[in-house]
């Protein structure tokens, strides 16, 4: 039977083709999800953005501050590790705190999009990122620095960071697929909902996954070329392995691939590259681990003491690991967070079953024959060893640094940590060459398209349902048509003020607090640009000021503003700046109306309040929002 293995010069995609395919697919999938996924929903995304901001300001290491007392943020006179962060960035992520579990609303969108860089910094704790070599945050740091320099809002800077993070991953994947052709097993794991979700976030996951695939591509290329492999491949591997090992500690095991790749060459430089990566990773850990102060998980023993304990009690270590990997609830959580959990929003059990089945269908046609397995026994053994070591390190890292001691189960391991080890183990049993028969090649790609399509559909459906579909809200019976007429207020421009009356139900003594206010505007067919100020007076007579963006407001729509929760008796609207005059719609009841028997009814501004119980109140006689 003829050997259909491509010559070594053709074992990667042409550079232009690789870039076009990776860019098109990533932009199509990632950009759609990026437009849907609310800010801050990726695990620890706020901390990652804080670390990126610190890098943009020249802070390589995290710092601590002196403090007094003993509490969650102060221990032995020191805070947890962190650094000085712009108040605007912190304000933005407080607004989008994922633990609020609120649906996204127009109030959140309008409040978030106007937050500027404040220019004032306060100390913020982000100890979970202190172990990572900061170079991996360079794309996000560049975006934040650029956004701040250009005067963009925090939100625009944040989405620029998402775009830069996605672009950096695209470039690394392009290089990987140029070095060695895309492996269907690897692509399948990149297309599960969890991977797509992280691709669209501003975290470091997509770049780390791309770097891991680059290391794998270099390894497979070297395994094919053997002694003819150029030294540049090994130094490229060394850089990627260093970035991986210092950003994802369990992936430091990929130095084993470098050693296995260097063995057949019988040259000094490949071994020098492997040694350099190993020493650099250990050196960074020796610097970062002692310098990072993290007491989020209260423990009486430090990381070093926990390591020493298990070194002296290896049987206890085996028992903890065995108990963890045989616990049914833990296994279910690993599968769910491997295939797809959007922060705290899992998919259905049926969806997980379908996704697992599709991944298996993609992999089955790629399995290598026994002859192929034996032809590259050393390389395949290295893949197995590295995958197993990476999995073990993921559990050990969380046991030593995160799990309360003494432990019965390892806590903190997420299924997405095992993505790269799974790739390595699958590649150990899959064929690395293109399919011999064209129909099999077409079958592989067809299955990948189906998997990608299904992943996108279930991801979009779950994201919309979890974060946007509101529960049914019934308007009060007072919102009914009544005799009268809508009238525009006098045109308002910069410096103009108008008093806004609130719906009568807002003033009820037992009414829930108001946290959102809207007012209906008429723009005379124009699209507004500008800023307004709401001054709210509560029942105690205290005043609260809220800035409102008028940008992109169109004719006959409500402008919403998020306000501090409270009970308000008076609201004044003042126009600060703007390019076009507009009016606030008012409702004047008909004279002689039984509800308002006065001869000259006073027009009431068309306002709307949103209360903390998520109910809405509308000024009687006014139209509701579109």
Give residue ranges: language-model regions.
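Membrane-interface helix-loop-helix junctions at transmembrane boundaries of multi-pass membrane enzymes
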Residues: 182, 227-230, 266-272, 364-389
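Perimembrane helix-loop-helix junctions
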Residues: 5, 218-228, 252-281
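Membrane-embedded helix bundles of polyisoprenyl
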Residues: 26, 183-200, 206-223, 233-244, ...
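Start-transfer (signal-anchor) and selected internal transmembrane alpha helices
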Residues: 1-31, 74, 272-277, 375, ...
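C-terminal luminal/periplasmic domains and tails of membrane-associated envelope-modifying transferases
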Residues: 471-626
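Interfacial juxtamembrane loops and adjacent helix segments
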Residues: 59-160
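Membrane-lumen/periplasm interface segments of multi-pass, membrane-embedded glycan/lipid transferases
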Residues: 288-371
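Transmembrane-helix motifs of polytopic, lipid-linked glycan transferases
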Residues: 159-182
């Amino acid at each position: 039977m003829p050997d259909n293995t491509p010559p070594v010069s053709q074992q990667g995609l042409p550079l232009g083709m690789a870039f076009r395919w990776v860019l098109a697919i990533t932009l199509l999938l990632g950009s759609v999800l990026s437009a849907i996924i609310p800010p801050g929903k990726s695990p620890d995304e706020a901390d990652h953005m804080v670390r990126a901001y610190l890098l943009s300001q020249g802070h390589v290491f995290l710092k601590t501050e002196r403090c007094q007392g003993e509490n969650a943020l102060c221990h032995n006179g020191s805070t947890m590790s962190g650094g000085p962060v712009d108040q605007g960035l912190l304000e933005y992520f407080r607004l989008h705190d994922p633990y609020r579990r609120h649906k996204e609303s127009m109030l959140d969108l309008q409040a978030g999009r106007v937050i500027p860089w404040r220019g004032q910094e306060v100390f913020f704790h982000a100890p979970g990122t202190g172990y990572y070599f900061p170079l991996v945050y360079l794309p996000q740091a560049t975006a934040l620095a650029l956004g701040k320099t250009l005067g963009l809002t925090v939100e625009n800077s944040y989405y620029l960071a998402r775009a830069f993070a996605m672009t950096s991953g695209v470039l690394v994947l392009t290089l990987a697929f140029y070095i060695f052709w895309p492996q269907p097993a690897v692509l399948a794991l990149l297309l599960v909902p969890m991977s797509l979700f992280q691709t669209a976030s501003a975290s470091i996951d997509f770049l780390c996954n791309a770097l891991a695939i680059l290391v794998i591509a270099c390894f497979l290329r070297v395994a094919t070329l053997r002694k003819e492999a150029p030294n540049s491949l090994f130094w490229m591997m060394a850089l990627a392995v260093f970035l991986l090992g210092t950003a994802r500690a369990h992936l430091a095991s990929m130095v084993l691939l470098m050693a296995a790749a260097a063995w057949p060459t019988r040259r000094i430089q490949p071994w020098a590259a492997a040694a350099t990566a190993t020493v650099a990773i250990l050196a960074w850990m020796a610097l970062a681990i002692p310098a990072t102060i993290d007491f989020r998980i209260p423990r009486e023993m430090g990381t070093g003491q926990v390591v020493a304990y298990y070194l002296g009690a290896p049987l206890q270590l085996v028992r903890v690991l065995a108990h963890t990997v045989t616990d049914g609830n833990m296994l279910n959580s690993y599968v769910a967070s491997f295939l797809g959990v959007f922060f705290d929003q899992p998919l259905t059990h049926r969806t997980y079953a379908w996704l697992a089945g599709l991944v298996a269908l993609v992999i089955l046609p790629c399995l290598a024959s026994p002859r192929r397995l034996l032809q590259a026994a050393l390389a395949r053994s290295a893949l197995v060893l590295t995958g197993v070591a990476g999995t073990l390190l993921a559990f050990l890292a969380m046991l030593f640094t995160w799990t309360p001691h003494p432990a019965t189960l390892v806590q903190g391991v997420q299924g997405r940590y095992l993505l790269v080890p799974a790739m390595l183990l699958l590649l150990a049993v899959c064929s690395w060459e293109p399919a011999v028969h064209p129909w099999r090649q077409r079958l592989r790609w067809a299955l990948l398209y189906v998997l990608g399509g299904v992943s996108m559909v279930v991801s979009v459906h779950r994201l919309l349902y979890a974060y946007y579909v509101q529960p049914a809200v019934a308007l009060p019976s007072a919102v009914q048509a009544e005799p009268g007429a809508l009238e525009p207020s006098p045109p308002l421009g910069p410096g103009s003020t108008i008093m806004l009356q609130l719906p009568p139900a807002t003033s009820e003594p037992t009414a829930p607090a108001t946290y959102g206010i809207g007012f209906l505007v008429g723009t005379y067919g124009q699209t507004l640009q500008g800023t307004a100020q709401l001054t709210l007076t509560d029942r105690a007579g205290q005043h609260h000021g809220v800035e409102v963006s008028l940008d992109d407001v169109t004719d006959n729509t409500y402008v919403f503003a998020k306000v501090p929760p409270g009970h308000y008796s008076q609201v004044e609207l003042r126009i600060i700046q703007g390019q076009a005059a507009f009016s606030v719609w008012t409702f004047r009841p008909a004279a002689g109306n039984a509800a308002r028997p006065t001869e000259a009814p006073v027009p009431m501004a068309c306002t709307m309040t949103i209360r903390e119980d998520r109910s809405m109140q509308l000024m009687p006689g006014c139209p509701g929002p579109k």
